[in-house]
Amino acid sequence: MSRLQFQLQTRDGRARRGRLTFPRGTVETPAFMPVGTYGSVKGILPDQVRALGAEIILGNTFHLYLRPGLDIIADHGGLHGFCRWDGPILTDSGGFQVFSLAHRRKITEQGVTFASPTDGARVFLGPEESMKIQKVLDSDVVMIFDECTPYPATEDVARRSMELSLRWAQRSRNAHDELGNDAALFGIVQGGVHTDLRSRSADALQAIGFDGYAIGGLAVGEPEDERNAMLDHLDPELPADRPRYLMGVGRPEDLVEGVARGVDMFDCVMPTRNARNGHYFTSFGTVRIRNSQYARDMDPIEPGCGCVACTGGYTRSYLRHLDRCNEMLAPMLGTLHNLFYYEKLMADIRAAIEAGTFLAFRESFYAARGAVAPPL
């Protein structure tokens, strides 16, 4: 039996308010998961990540397998001890990273052979290997090994990719069970932007049986309206009593639209990566701190924000100076602000669903940006 329990508490339209319960902690949903690719959310301490409101983080199976390697992580008793995060961790399977290698990989029925981006060595990764790696990592949510369908892709290419992912899903399920791993195992719905393929994938995954269902292949360059159309299509096709996870999608607008279409979990490097590039998220849009207009701006990133960067009195002028001088403090403060913004956005979304006012919240979210909400 999986160590995950999921409770769907209430709905407001298609928006869902729930709770994930693990032995290592509880996660209120909808939830945003900060990404710790190498076992660290870049630039800040685990205690700071927790203080910002995050209850679960994501680790990268592919990169951790290559560096530092499983033996070293096993010496620490698993990924939690290694990175000093005592809450739940979700690990991806490595499929998306293999997809991103493009010309340096070869896909067969057995799995993927690729040149390591760290030293060029030949590496093989398949469903069984991915499940073994994630067992050593001792993550709380394990993702099946799949092939991320590219965009654009013809229906034939998307079909063959989806069917391969389904065969790998069954092998992942078998390997996970044979290892005696009680971590939750999530299936991943593929099929590109073809509704019939998405339906077939969702049905086949439910026949195999998983603890949750992720929606993959919707962070690969497809237009927003096509992504939303796929979420609209899948909402009634996925089981209501299992969590839904939209992989790698992470603009604030994407989170709001995903929640409006029944998604419970999100992850993205955007808040941390953008912070390192001087892009700070606010309720009225993005502050691009490198712009000259902020050279003598005495306001914090967002007046009224409760993050340490804003309450600490650090001005946009100062942050621009730090960024231009490549000072480490700039991305640290930016990351603290961006993740605070993301976690507060999710908390506000949860409160709106509980109050039955999510649609009004959605309208005000866009109005603050001078925009109009897309049709539902």
UniProtKB/Swiss-Prot annotation:
What positions constitute the catalytic site?
92 (proton acceptor), 267 (nucleophile)
Q: Can you cite a GO biological process for this protein?
A: tRNA-guanine transglycosylation
Q: How is the cofactor bound?
A: Binds 1 zinc ion per subunit.
Pathway membership: tRNA modification; tRNA-queuosine biosynthesis
Q: Which cofactor does it need?
A: Zn(2+)
Gene Ontology molecular functions: metal ion binding; tRNA-guanosine(34) queuine transglycosylase activity
Q: Where is the signal peptide?
A: none
Residues annotated for substrate binding in this entry: 92-96, 146, 190, 217
Domain of life, source organism:
Bacteria
> What Gene Ontology cellular-component terms does the record carry?
cytosol
Q: Which InterPro entries does the entry link to?
A: ArchSynthase1/Queuine_TRR, TGT, TGT-like_sf, tRNA_ribo_trans-like
SUPFAM superfamilies, per database record: tRNA-guanine transglycosylase (SSF51713)
The UniProt keywords, alphabetically, are:
Glycosyltransferase, Metal-binding, Queuosine biosynthesis, Transferase, tRNA processing, Zinc
Q: Which residues bind Zn(2+)?
A: 305, 307, 310, 337
Q: Name one Pfam family in it.
A: TGT
The EC number on file is 2.4.2.29
| Region described as RNA binding | 248-254, 272-276
Q: Which reaction does it catalyse?
A: 7-aminomethyl-7-carbaguanine + guanosine(34) in tRNA = 7-aminomethyl-7-carbaguanosine(34) in tRNA + guanine
Subunit record text: Homodimer. Within each dimer, one monomer is responsible for RNA recognition and catalysis, while the other monomer binds to the replacement base PreQ1.
Q: What does this protein do?
A: Catalyzes the base-exchange of a guanine (G) residue with the queuine precursor 7-aminomethyl-7-deazaguanine (PreQ1) at position 34 (anticodon wobble position) in tRNAs with GU(N) anticodons (tRNA-Asp, -Asn, -His and -Tyr). Catalysis occurs through a double-displacement mechanism. The nucleophile active site attacks the C1' of nucleotide 34 to detach the guanine base from the RNA, forming a covalent enzyme-RNA intermediate. The proton acceptor active site deprotonates the incoming PreQ1, allowing a nucleophilic attack on the C1' of the ribose to form the product.
Q: Which family does it belong to?
A: Belongs to the queuine tRNA-ribosyltransferase family.
- The molecule here is called Queuine tRNA-ribosyltransferase
Q: Which organism is it from?
A: Stenotrophomonas maltophilia (strain R551-3)
* Highest classification ranks of the organism: Bacteria, Pseudomonadati, Pseudomonadota, Gammaproteobacteria, Lysobacterales
